[in-house]
C-alpha cells in the first residue's frame, strides 16, 4: 500500500468536533518527544504535515489527517511532560479518554515508545488503557537509528517485558531518520483498514 495523499482535516478537543463521515481511524499515541510527529511525517512522506514541536507537550489537540481520501490517521496529544501543570495533564488525559471510550470508528491504536529507554509508567498506563478499551494495539519503538545492531534484541526484550506484551502482540522498530522499512510499516499499520488499496 502506498500513501499518495495526506491532508490535515481538523484539530478537535470535544467529540462534536470529530469528523462525522464514518471512515476508519488509526490513532497514534506516545510520550512528548517520542518522535510521533516525525513518524507521521515520515510515513506520509510530508515534511510538515504534523508539526514537529521543539517544546514537549505543546500538542494539546487531537489532530485528524485524511489518508488517500480513505481513512484517518489520528494524532493524539503527547503525554508525560513533567513541566506541565497537573490541571493541564488532567485536561489532556480527559481529552484522550473521551476519544478512546466513545469512538466506534477507531480500529487500531499505535503506541510509540523510545527504543533507547525502558517504557515509563505513563507508557504502561497508556498501553493498558488502550487494551482495556478493547482496541487492537501495535507497539512501535522509535529512534531505532540510535541503536547499535547488538542492542536491538535487548531493547525489544526490555520493552516487551515492561509492557507485559505477549508473543502475539505486534512490535516494530522504526527510524524516521533512515526510514528503513517504511512501506512494510505502512502495510502493517494501515492495510487492513484501507478500502482504496494500491
UniProtKB/Swiss-Prot annotation:
Domain of life, source organism: Bacteria
GO molecular function ontology, one term from the record: GTP binding
Q: Which UniProt keywords apply?
A: Cell cycle, Cell division, GTP-binding, Magnesium, Metal-binding, Nucleotide-binding, Septation
Quote the InterPro entries the UniProt record gives: G_ENGB_dom, GTP-bd, GTP-bd_ribosome_bio_YsxC, P-loop_NTPase
Q: Where does Mg(2+) bind?
A: 37, 59
UniProt keyword annotation of Cell division present: yes
Ribonucleoprotein among keywords: no
Which PROSITE patterns does the entry mention?
A: G_ENGB
- Positions annotated to bind GTP: 30-37, 57-61, 75-78, 142-145, 174-176
GO terms classed as biological process: division septum assembly
Q: GO CC terms for this protein?
A: cytosol
Name the cofactor(s).
Answer: Mg(2+)
What region holds the EngB-type G domain?
A: 22-195
Kindly give the CDD domains that the UniProt entry links to this protein: YihA_EngB (cd01876)
Question: What is the stated purpose of this protein?
Answer: Necessary for normal cell division and for the maintenance of normal septation.
The record, for NCBIfam families, names: GTPase_YsxC
State the family it belongs to: Belongs to the TRAFAC class TrmE-Era-EngA-EngB-Septin-like GTPase superfamily. EngB GTPase family.
Q: What is this protein called?
A: Probable GTP-binding protein EngB
Q: Which organism is it from?
A: Clostridium botulinum (strain Alaska E43 / Type E3)
Q: What is this organism's lineage?
A: Bacteria, Bacillati, Bacillota, Clostridia, Eubacteriales
**Coding gene?**
engB
Amino acid at each position: 500500500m502506498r500513501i499518495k495523499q495526506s491532508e490535515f482535516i481538523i484539530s478537535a478537543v470535544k467529540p462534536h468536533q470529530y469528523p462525522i463521515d464514518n471512515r476508519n481511524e488509526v490513532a497514534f499515541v506516545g510520550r512528548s518527544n517520542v518522535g510521533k510527529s516525525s513518524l507521521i511525517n515520515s510515513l506520509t512522506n510530508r515534511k510538515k504535515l504534523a508539526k514537529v514541536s521543539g517544546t514537549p507537550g505543546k500538542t494539546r489537540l487531537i489532530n485528524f489527517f485524511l489518508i488517500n481520501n480513505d481513512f484517518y490517521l489520528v494524532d493524539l496529544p503527547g503525554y508525560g511532560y513533567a513541566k506541565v501543570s497537573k490541571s493541564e495533564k488532567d485536561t489532556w488525559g480527559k481529552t484522550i479518554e473521551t476519544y478512546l471510550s466513545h469512538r466506534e470508528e477507531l480500529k487500531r491504536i499505535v503506541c510509540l515508545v523510545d527504543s533507547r529507554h525502558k517504557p515509563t509508567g505513563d507508557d504502561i498506563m497508556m498501553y493498558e488503557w488502550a487494551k482495556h478499551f478493547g482496541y487492537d494495539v501495535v507497539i512501535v519503538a522509535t529512534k531505532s537509528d540510535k541503536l547499535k545492531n547488538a542492542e536491538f534484541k535487548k531493547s525489544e526484550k526490555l520493552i516487551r517485558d515492561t509492557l507485559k506484551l505477549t508473543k502475539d502482540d505486534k512490535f516494530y522498530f522504526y527510524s524516521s531518520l533512515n526510514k528503513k522499512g517504511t512501506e512494510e510499516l505502512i502495510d502493517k499499520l494501515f492495510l487492513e483498514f484501507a478500502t482504496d488499496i494500491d
